[in-house]
UniProtKB/Swiss-Prot annotation:
The gene is VAChT. Its main location: membrane. This is Vesicular acetylcholine transporter. Glycans are attached at N78, N293. The keyword Transmembrane applies. Residues 54-98, 147-154, 209-215, 285-299, 352-355, 409-413 are lumenal, vesicle. The chain crosses the membrane at residues 33-53, 99-119, 126-146, 155-175, 188-208, 216-236, 264-284, 300-320, 331-351, 356-376, 388-408, 414-434. It is a multi-pass membrane protein. It is found in: Membrane. One of its GO terms (cellular component) is terminal bouton. Involved in acetylcholine transport into synaptic vesicles. Residues 507-534, 549-563 have a biased composition (Low complexity).
Length: 578
């Protein structure tokens, strides 16, 4: 049976498949594809987290999980006729919504220590596939769930999937992008997708929930998760082969508790936790605060987060460019971002308009971008310099830092809002962020251990950069053809001179031989004549001894003695000097 031939390119499907598979297996394309897969996985995970912000409070009230009780009639001022707003008693809805939000982070916090160690042992591809599979099922359960208990189970299941997918994704980027600037840029792109998921998901979920129902946004995200898993199948085999080649490094795994005891890593982890405290406390509470003070439209409540995407991406770009020029000042960028978050939390409770509220939220997201983009590459750098370049446990610590904020934040936020109000909650967030800023000063000296500027970590299977030309160490000739080892070069050049000193000595001998010939012509015997029988006959004179000729004769005798002993050893092209 003849295979189908594609009309335009005149190639069979099998040939096209082989060409595409060969291109995918190239190291450069592998890294690009891995970055795309990890970015989609992080986008999906954060969209699943944030898409429920405008949906869950209204949906739980709709299915009757909470009862607001009898609504009192609106009060009117007898003089002006102005309607006085009535305080809504949510009957524990703040706390219950916060627990539902925090269930994902609590499970993720418990699974992360095990997922990080497992990733260090077996590689990155299989744990990431496990995470995507769990996230797919949790999203499907979210779409079909119609009670608080089912939604709680789906939310917790998503936390287990995130513990594998997020940690494996960040570790995979750090492992494949070993050069510091490339790693910062790749992690910056991944953080841009994280921000896109966090900030676009609320308007995405709110609009689809209001106009199409609760099931539609979750079914779309489940489809994206399935497609990302299929893309991961394309890189699983090559990545697994690479892990087998570096098995000797995998055996030197550093325990996660030992990394946590490192003071520099602990400071970075604390900063990542504090950077996410603001969003973790505000996300489950600001929607109810907006319903009481601004608007009850679900799409508007979700849309308040959308403009913050642009300053977040701007913060990522600025931090990547600044880190490339001033890597020793990344701690200062993180400190500035944390201070911006604290000042913005002071402003939020005093915002009286919908558009005014967008401004401090944008500044908060800009500060988060500064912190995350500066500290995530710093964690990989600390492991490279102080430990072994295995990244599962270190990025499990980063994921634990996020999980602590999102596990504790929603639960405490709901209780604080019910006890002392939304304004006091924002003040507590602001003071905690500003208090942690001086702690980041401990990171100011970590780049004293920075390698030489021209020294770079490369992957052995990557092709050489076209900016460089490889030369043989011996005679400075470009390497022709394929790559050879030192034994092959030794066989190729064994007939040539062994060292640069031999070349100089050989030139010296040639020069002295020419000098000797000139000496004989100039200083040699000019024939004298004696009259013998009416004719002149030449009469010889004794030749003056030439020290250079004697030296040459001695050297020739020594060479003959060496040749009589046997063949010389092969020349070593890497030996220099004597």
């Amino acid at each position: 049976m003849a295979s189908f031939q594609i009309p335009v390119i005149n190639l069979e499907v099998r040939e096209v498949k082989d060409i595409v598979w060969e291109k995918i297996q190239e190291p450069v394309n592998q890294r690009r594809l891995i970055l795309v897969i990890v970015s989609i996985a992080l986008l999906l995970d954060n969209m699943l987290y944030m898409v429920i912000v405008p949906i869950i409070p209204d949906y739980l009230r709709e299915i009757g999980s909470f009862d607001d009780g009898p609504t009192p009639p609106p009060l009117r001022d007898n003089i002006t006729g102005k309607i006085i707003p009535v305080h809504h008693d949510h009957h524990g809805q703040d706390s219950a919504t916060g627990i539902l939000f925090a269930s994902k982070a609590i499970v993720q916090l418990m699974v992360n220590p095990f997922s990080g160690g497992l990733i260090d042992k077996i590689g990155y591809d299989l744990p990431m596939m496990i995470g995507l599979t769990i996230m797919f099922f949790s999203t499907a359960v979210f779409a079909c769930g119609s009670s608080y208990s089912v939604l709680f189970f789906a939310r917790s299941l998503q936390g287990a999937g995130s513990a594998f997918a997020d940690t494996a994704g960040l570790a995979m980027i750090a492992d494949r992008f070993t050069e510091e600037n490339e790693r910062s840029q790749a992690l910056g792109i991944a953080l841009a997708f994280i921000s896109f998921g966090c900030l676009v998901a609320p308007p995405f979920g709110g609009a689809l929930y209001q106009f199409a129902g609760k099931e539609v946004p979750f079914l779309i995200l489940a489809l994206v998760c399935l497609l990302d898993g299929l893309m991961l199948l394309l890189v699983m085999k090559p990545v697994k082969e690479a892990m087998k080649q570096s098995k000797d490094v995998q055996d030197q795994v550093i325990p996660i508790w030992r990394l946590l005891m490192d003071p520099y890593i602990a400071v970075c982890a604390g900063a990542l936790t504090m950077s996410n405290v603001a969003l973790a406390f505000l996300e489950p509470t600001i929607s109810l605060w907006m319903e009481d003070n601004m608007t009850t439209d679900n799409w508007k409540i979700g849309m308040v987060w959308l403009p913050a995407f642009f300053p977040h991406v701007l913060g990522v770009v600025i931090t990547v460019k600044m880190a490339r020029k001033y890597p020793q000042h990344q701690w200062l960028m993180a400190a500035g971002g944390l201070a911006l978050e604290g000042f913005s939390c002071f402003i939020i409770p005093f915002c009286s308009g919908y558009k005014m509220l967008m401004l401090p939220i944008c500044v908060i997201c800009f500060g988060i971008a500064l912190i995350d983009t500066a500290l995530l590459p710093t964690l990989g750098y600390l492991v490279d310099v102080r430990y072994v370049s295995v990244y599962g446990s270190i990025y499990a610590i980063a994921d634990i830092s996020y999980s602590i904020a999102y596990a504790v934040g929603p639960i405490i936020a709901g209780g604080v809002v019910e006890a002392i109000g939304f304004t006091a909650l924002n003040f507590l967030i602001a003071f905690s962020n500003l208090a942690y800023v001086p702690v980041l000063r401990k990171l100011r000296n970590i780049y004293d251990f920075k390698p030489f500027e021209n020294e770079a970590n490369i992957l052995m299977q990557d092709p050489p950069n076209k900016e460089y030309q490889t030369y043989v160490m011996h005679d400075q000739k470009p390497v022709e053809g394929g790559v050879k080892n030192h034994l092959e070069y030794g066989q190729q050049y064994q007939q040539e001179q062994e060292t640069n000193l031999d070349d100089q000595q050989y030139e010296y001998q040639q020069q002295q031989q020419g000098y000797q010939q000139g000496y004989q012509q100039d200083q040699g015997y000019q024939p004298g004549y004696q009259e013998q029988g009416g004719s002149y006959a030449p009469q010889g004179q004794p030749r003056v001894a030439n020290p250079f000729q004697q030296q040459q004769q001695q050297q020739q005798q020594q060479q003959q003695q060496v040749q009589s002993r046997g063949p010389a050893a092969p020349a070593n092209p890497f030996r220099q000097g004597f």
